[in-house]
Amino acid sequence: MKTIKEKVKESFEMLKTEFGYKNAMQAPKIQKVIVSSGVGSIKDKKKIDLVEDRLSKITGQKPARKGAKISIASFKVRQGDIVGMQITLRGARMYDFLDRLINLALPRTKDFRGISSNGIDGMGNYSFGIKENTIFPECSDEELKDVFGMAVTVVTNVKNPKETKAFLTHLGFPFKKVETKEIKEKPKREKKPKAE
């Protein structure tokens, strides 16, 4: 099976006829992958450490703690309180994470039928959510009691949603297959002339 890195190198040859690339510098590339997660209870120090530990196991890199930008009295959040974690992956770690995500983690999701392509924006970014961190093999069965979700953003150099989807499909992202149903037209009724 080819790795994501090998597929990225092949992307120029695979997509040049469809999108009219003239040289290899126009070929799409993945620039970075951002993985982020909220910590839930900000007062629970154990939960913050737990999320940090598991994200570092999943990605192979220590996450940066993100503090609240403003104080919100109704949520009892003060400016600077830790509310989430974020990791930016580049290079070899990025490709390793994507390989594990596509080939191991996503197929382990319960009732998995593909990921939605609605998260593709006009700037070449694709964002999607993962409901449970336990789909990754790094999170063992002993750790099932504290499950959290995460958001993954794949940043590419493509500036067109159609091109982005074709590139990510070539890399092996399992997008949902949209079934198009034929819409039957209702027969038109003939209008009866009004009686005078």
What is the role of each PLM region?
Residues 1-196:
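Ribosome-associated RNA-binding proteins
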